């Protein structure tokens, strides 16, 4: 076996252009969305792997474009020839287009997964140019990507094998280009054990797995870079510090903003000029970037090329897939520097940061009220215009906000619900909504067969079921203050020794016990009033501060308690969840149901101390007291 190549890296002579796969603008426009995603993943891994191996590789423009989501094509004159002068080449006329495409495949897969000293085919890019001249732009771009995909499937190698020159004939690469022809690196390149990494990409293996989110990678360097996201490393987004600190020569004459590349300046200037050169052939809508046009065209075709491997959900944009996958991995890379809270989306972090600054930049022109979010302002403006774009497909009632319609639709009886022992699952037919809103085309409701209450989420429904079952949510034997341990999962282990009332949770029992002891550990600093519960103190303090954090999205009315907001929202949705078992009459508030039930039972718990007359409602007793007050005034 030939000795391994020297470990010294010829850093000064290596640039990323020597190992890159490049497209012209015309070729790039013939590449589909899924193929563009494949190209982006391979190129970024190529660059990141070279940097992780210690090579002084300056960030090229194509990588900068890929990281920014821009189009990575370059002009013909920018495509470079091979850097190694010792490699022999065949005359251009004797080389077929297919051979050039095959070379693209080998270079794409090999160069990004080994050290530069182990790669013999970094110089074949110059040969690709001769093959490119034989192909049109569409054929050239399609052959590059298609051959790349096919060869990955056809040339899978075993786990213990390594890539050597035996693979070269399979890829139809000209025999005039061999590692033995290179006097700079020599024959040592044929027997490099580090090429075993190549088997991972051909076999689609990702042996390096993140312990926190279980995401897998082909290279250890990619894993190391990913782990910085969890650690909060400020340079974990793949930004090259050297490029960041480099000079920006291209300045916008309108706003003074500078850019590293002229193409970036050209695209930026379209913001000022309003130029949108890329127009949709279907609807005529124009865009500043061709990538935006490609994403828009998917809306017409319905194509969703980006599919989640875990749940199968498909998306039109790769960025949407990346954001969706964070739901499965739990990754929240955007962290607030003030409170440490993390978010899956950068927009969510931006909206959250406003809560710290208190800034409300969006102001209503009608009444002057300010909001921290643009969406909140849009919702508020409907209270002035009276616009109600969300209409119920069953009864025709319209609402100003989509959540109000969502809540309203739960009150309708479902014709064919899915029944189970504990709940019903129902769907509202798929009906179009105004302004293209499709979020309400499918409404799921969990219906309790014991009390008839509906829930929008399975977690809320499960919690509600415990009220009927008396189930201990902890699911284990617990004791509190000498109480007996839980002997059955449906028992309430925490029982009050004074009144005998039992509770599922120890915290509920402790709060209840303060009723008997009179303990009120939570005291208001303003007026000195004390409370037995912390939540009661929090609500009381709002009477001093005037804070009303719970705002109705329909009319803008604010409340100091969330329960008050819930009751108020029912005036908009028409929901009446509390139904009388005797006559079927429904009510918005539980207290109204209790008052009504006394008309059936005849109970009158409110007695007048003056005359002894009894009433079923406290409000009726209050009115009655006024009669005695007037009589006393008349007598005096």
UniProtKB/Swiss-Prot annotation:
Q: Where is this cross-link: Glycyl lysine isopeptide (Lys-Gly) (interchain with G-Cter in SUMO2)?
A: 444
**Where does the record say this protein resides?**
Nucleus
Question: Which parts of the chain span the membrane according to its record?
Answer: none
Q: Provide the GO biological process annotations.
A: negative regulation of DNA binding; negative regulation of DNA-templated transcription; negative regulation of transcription by RNA polymerase II; positive regulation of DNA-templated transcription
Entry keyword set: DNA-binding, Isopeptide bond, Metal-binding, Nucleus, Repeat, Repressor, Transcription, Transcription regulation, Ubl conjugation, Zinc, Zinc-finger
Quote any Pfam family the record assigns.
zf-C2H2
Does Repeat count among this protein's keywords? yes
Where do the record's region annotations for Disordered lie? Answer: 227-247
Which molecular-function annotation in GO is an example for this chain? Answer: zinc ion binding
Judging by the UniProt lineage, the source's domain of life is: Eukaryota
Record PROSITE patterns: KRAB, ZINC_FINGER_C2H2_1, ZINC_FINGER_C2H2_2
Q: Which SUPFAM superfamilies match?
A: beta-beta-alpha zinc fingers, KRAB domain (Kruppel-associated box)
Q: How does it assemble?
A: Interacts (via N- and C-termini) with REST (via zinc-finger DNA-binding domain); the interaction inhibits REST repressor activity.
Function description: Inhibits the transcriptional repressor activity of REST by inhibiting its binding to DNA, thereby derepressing transcription of REST target genes.
Spell out the family assignment given in the record's similarity comment: Belongs to the krueppel C2H2-type zinc-finger protein family.
Q: Which protein are we looking at?
A: Zinc finger protein 90
